[in-house]
Amino acid sequence: RLFNPRRYNPDEWAELARAAGIKYVVFTAKHHAGFCMWDTRTTPFNVINTAYGKDLTRPLAEAFRRQGIAVGLYFSPDDFWWLNQHGKPINRAPFPGVTPQELPELMAYDKAQIRELLTGFGKIDLFFIDGPAEGLRELCWEIDPDIVVTRGAIETPEQFIPGLPLSGAWEANLTMGTEWPYK
């Protein structure tokens, strides 16, 4: 199917979020498939090269910021598109040989994308790294020492709430259904 979110309206979303008392939003800038929801210079596999042809990340960040809501971005360092383009198996850790920590070229690619996201979209309050964060979280803190980084300073148990308090800051990472994708 053709990706063309013609009814995308981040201003409406932000107004509803403010009315609901939401304090922060986390937008998926890049998931495991590697598709980038912003106008990146790092890859042609991005929203600009779709029928929609416009950045989705910038208007969302601006809309939520106007409503006084903190802006977070979700970023997967696992990038199936990149792995495929470089003849690597499409998989995630703990599968060996597919993480940025094992592939210097993928680490450089991820870092370039993180630099774009943390320097080109105004203040980003939270950066959610969904995967091995070593080398990436440090870059986030180098760019903005005050940014909150998951898998860096906050643990994010997935699809459950721990029975006992965790030792540090944490946030339960739950879906509204039984799966991560929309159904």
Language-model segments: residues:
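Mature catalytic domains of secreted/periplasmic carbohydrate-active enzymes
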Residues: 1-183
